[in-house]
Regions:
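Ser/Thr-centered flexible coil motifs
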Residues: 69, 75-76, 267, 286, ...
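Short, flexible/disordered secondary-structure transition segments
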Residues: 29, 33, 37, 42, ...
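AAA+ P-loop ATPase mechanoenzymes
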Residues: 1-108, 113-116
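Walker A/P-loop NTP-binding motif of AAA+ ATPase domains
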Residues: 2, 6, 85-300, 312
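A short, hydrophobic/aromatic-rich structural module that often spans a beta strand
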Residues: 54-58, 247, 257, 364-374
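Generic hydrophobic alpha-helical segments
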Residues: 25, 35-38, 116, 229, ...
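C-terminal engagement/docking regions of AAA+ P-loop ATPases
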Residues: 3-7, 295, 300-307, 317-374
Length: 374
């Protein structure tokens, strides 16, 4: 009873009043939250990313690629955004057998990186034999750096995050730092974990006074979380980067990547191995001289050799289409088609080589001193 005003409220009236106020507050809260979500242009992308991340984590939990299950309800929204970039090794078709001419690099990578992860008990008594915190693959374009990363993801059977650095840049102040922090907090929860950054020079290039404040803060935080004062030395979180411009990387980044592997242009012997690997399942004529092609293709990368063989294979299909009418090859089944199409000949490879040599001359990717002046 309110004696001064002479107005009294029964217990039921007070309860109804509180219920109404609570209902209005709840409606206002959820309405405001819905409006904020609608105003956020990345809301749909975030929702899809979280859904994909949950599917990937559930898929990995059913395999041996996670040492222990992760409670997805305990992951933050930012960690779920990063988890969207987790790679399932079963989805990768590249293995060590698909890489030719880099046996020394692969063997060293297995011994210094993969073995300490897979057989951790063998290296527990020494800090010197622990897996490095950073790995740098550098060399000319098209020489197999990304293929090595793919094969590593498949063969290590550990959590592998293919980090898209564009996700770390956000227009809202402070969001980039939260996402950067989520990269490492998620990796620690999923360890052992490898974080792969392709074209790492575009993200962690040398710092200077021209850097934007947000970019400089993000780089500093990334390095601090990677190997800083509060970094747990027992954590098995490895950063693997690939670049063809190692000179552009910050010195502090190079210090954090002690395991460096130069993936250079293949020599004649390596080119022969690459050509044999590319053509091993292709129909080739008896006159094909792989050794001669390997000798001619100096300064060609593995990617160039792949394109050379692809063009040569296209020539034989083109000849088939020229000698057969449309009605003829539309009604032809697969077996008859493969019997009718001729194999790849030496002439196809030489024609493809001349075409690619001309293209490389115009783009400046073939040394003038190496040209054959007929």
């Amino acid at each position: 009873m309110n004696v001064a005003d002479g107005v009294g409220y029964s217990r039921s009236e007070v309860f109804v009043l509180v219920a109404r106020v609570s209902f209005v507050a709840a409606v206002g809260f959820f309405s405001m939250k819905w409006i904020m979500n609608q105003l956020d242009p990345t809301n749909n992308a975030k929702r899809k990313a979280k859904k994909k991340a949950r599917e990937q984590l559930r898929k990995l939990a059913k395999t041996d690629n996670l040492l222990w299950s992760v409670d997805m309800d305990q992951l933050t929204d930012y960690e779920m955004m990063i988890a969207n970039h987790i790679v399932d090794p079963t989805d990768i078709r590249v293995s060590w057998e698909n890489i030719a001419g880099l046996e020394n690099v692969i063997q060293e990578l297995k011994e210094t990186v993969i073995l300490p992860i897979q057989r951790k008990e063998l290296f527990e008594d020494s800090q010197l034999t622990q897996a490095p915190k950073g790995i740098l693959l550098h060399g000319p374009p098209g020489c197999g750096k990304t293929m090595i990363a793919k094969a590593t993801a498949k063969e290590t059977k550990t959590c592998f995050i293919n980090l898209d650095v564009s996700i770390l840049t956000d227009k809202w102040y402070g969001e980039s730092q939260k996402l950067t922090s989520a990269v490492f907090s998620l990796a620690v929860k999923l360890q052992p974990c490898i974080i792969f950054i392709d074209e790492i020079d575009s993200f962690l290039r040398a710092r200077n006074s021209q850097d934007h404040e947000a970019t400089a803060m993000m780089k500093a935080q990334f390095m601090s979380l990677w190997d800083g004062l509060i970094t747990d030395p027992s954590c098995t979180v490895i950063i693997m980067g690939a670049t063809n411009r190692p000179q552009d990387l910050d010195r502090a980044i190079l210090r954090r990547m002690p395991a460096t592997f130069h993936i250079g242009l293949p020599n004649e012997s390596q080119r022969m191995q690459v050509l044999k690997l590319i053509l091993q399942h292709e129909p080739i004529a008896e006159n094909v001289d792989i050794a001669k092609i390997a000798k001619m293709t100096e300064n060609f990368s593995g990617s160039d050799l792949q394109e050379l063989c692809r063009n040569a294979s296209v020539y034989r299909v083109r000849d088939y289409l020229r000698t057969h009418t449309q009605d003829t090859y539309i009604g032809t089944d697969d077996e008859e088609y493969h019997d009718a199409v001729r194999p790849i000949t030496m002439e196809d490879l030489l024609t493809s080589y001349k075409k690619m040599k001309t293209s490389k001359i115009h783009t400046g990717t073939l040394g003038i001193a190496k040209l054959e002046l007929d």
